[in-house]
């Protein structure tokens, strides 16, 4: 009989210390021994802050700041040594883990030395090789902690599960990470070769998130915060029954709890709702996380590592019953670009031309606000606005280009928003009561988008949540609210 499988992925805060790594090992043990649970495959992030440390090390190595590089590397090694000493209590187990970490740091040092003499074109891949070590250190720690409490666990360390497209020729700023795209069939073959033999022996695989390897053999990465993405890529390749993302909140909340009091915990979301929330600024899921699993109807559950008994939020296929509202998120530092044909006549293909020019400038439209034969308005990241405007003015002939900066997109997401024709009016009235002007609005199935001044965004988030979300979603206790109360 085919074994039912699940992915359990732990983020950087979940493995942020030796004590937390022991706690993660106990969660793995519960999953393994509970007859109601599928067999677990563990995916881990780097310890909190480690990827940034590695990118600093890479930058120092490239710029010749050798003393700073050595200082950061020493601090990084100390961090993992301390985590190992607290995660493992058995002397022999700890000694073996420290030896494995020492070997890993020797390999990292070699990658740093190779980076120092790298030509400009090879910098992104050499930097990725350094940035990838955080997850590799984590799998050593988590697998060792699991073994110490009696779990048969093996780290998949030397080989990389996810195969990705080769990096493009486009140069990236120093200190950024590559966002490579996985190759489905090649990754599935890697899973069959590296993970299935462990599962057949009832050995729990512990694999690194974030990391890929190109078809040409270079280590690459799946983009900033890409461990969630790699978890669902591997989950799809294994045909898992569920992917659980363990983080430091109880699930997906109805708004940012740092700004809005009495946020609601959302028990479920559709794939479309979660994807739009992520696109418009919600931080719980990586924007690309749902791509590999949505067409397979594999649910994702967002759970709290530190309150593992809570059910969290399930993200899955479209709900049969539409909700009146789900959540509100804000994307900051945007610009509104309007392109107008001064003679009032335009061709349908002009929209395609505009977006092609925006893509050449390195900008993907965040939202489309209005479109007609002679008029098109869309939002882009503010930092890309000048390049987009320059290209449009150069290539669009008689078309007039207008740019308004300092804006934010306030996204009211939920299937009920798009089903209720009065939702936009209620949202605009709520903002009007707070004297917050709406610059323009757009549609984002499922939901509505309101463009406002960025300086008004926090007030807008509070009043929209108060008037649109709070009346229709019950208030329940969740961890974010309890932490806020304890901090008072």
Annotate the PLM regions.
Residues 311-488:
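A conserved regulatory-domain signal marking ACT and ACT-like small-molecule sensing domains
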Residues 150-155, 244, 301-302, 310, ...:
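Proline-centered turn/helix-capping motifs that create local helix->coil transitions or kinks
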């Amino acid at each position: 009989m085919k074994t039912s499988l699940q992915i359990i992925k732990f983020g950087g805060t979940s493995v942020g210390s030796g004590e937390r790594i022991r706690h993660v090992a106990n969660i793995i043990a519960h999953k393994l021994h509970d007859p109601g649970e599928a067999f677990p495959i563990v995916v881990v992030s780097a310890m909190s802050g480690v990827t940034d440390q590695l990118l600093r090390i890479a930058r120092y190595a490239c710029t010749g700041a050798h003393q700073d590089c050595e200082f950061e590397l020493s601090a990084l090694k100390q961090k993992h040594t301390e985590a190992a000493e607290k995660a493992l209590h058995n002397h022999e187990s700890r000694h073996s883990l420290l030896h494995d970490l020492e070997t890993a740091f020797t390999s990292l040092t070699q990658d740093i030395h190779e980076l120092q003499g790298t030509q400009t074109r090879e910098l992104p891949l050499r930097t990725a090789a350094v940035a990838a070590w955080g997850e590799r250190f984590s799998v050593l720690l988590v697998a060792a902690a699991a073994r110490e409490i009696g779990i048969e666990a093996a780290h998949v360390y030397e080989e990389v599960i996810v195969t990705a497209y080769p990096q493009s020729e486009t140069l990236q700023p120093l200190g950024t990470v590559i966002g490579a795209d996985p190759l489905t069939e090649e990754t599935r073959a890697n899973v069959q070769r590296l993970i299935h033999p462990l599962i057949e022996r009832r050995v729990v695989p512990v694999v690194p998130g974030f990391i890929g390897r190109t078809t040409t053999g270079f280590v690459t990465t799946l983009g900033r915060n890409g461990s969630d993405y790699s978890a669902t890529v591997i989950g799809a390749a294994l045909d898992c029954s569920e992917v659980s993302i363990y983080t430091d909140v109880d699930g997906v909340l109805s708004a940012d709890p740092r700004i809005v009091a009495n946020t609601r915990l959302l028990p479920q979301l559709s794939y479309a709702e979660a994807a739009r929330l992520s696109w418009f600024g919600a931080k719980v899921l990586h924007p690309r996380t749902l791509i590999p699993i949505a067409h397979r109807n594999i649910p994702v559950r967002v759970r709290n590592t530190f309150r593992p008994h809570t059910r969290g939020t399930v993200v899955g296929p479209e709900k049969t019953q539409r909700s009146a509202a789900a959540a509100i998120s804000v994307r900051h530092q945007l610009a509104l670009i309007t392109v107008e044909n001064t003679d009032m006549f335009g061709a349908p293909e002009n929209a395609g031309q505009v977006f092609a020019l925006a893509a050449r400038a390195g900008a993907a439209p965040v939202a489309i606000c209005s479109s007609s034969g002679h008029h098109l308005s869309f939002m882009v990241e503010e930092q890309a606005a000048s390049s987009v405007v320059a290209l449009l003015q150069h290539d669009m002939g008689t078309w007039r280009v207008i740019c308004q900066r300092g804006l934010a997109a306030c996204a009211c997401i939920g299937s009920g928003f798009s089903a209720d024709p009065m939702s936009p009016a209620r949202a605009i009235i709520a903002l009007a009561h707070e004297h917050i002007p709406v610059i323009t609005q757009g549609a984002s199935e499922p939901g509505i988008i309101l463009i406002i001044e960025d300086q008004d965004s926090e007030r807008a988030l509070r009043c929209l949540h108060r008037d649109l979300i709070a009346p229709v979603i019950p208030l329940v206790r969740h961890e974010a609210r309890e932490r806020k109360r304890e901090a008072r």
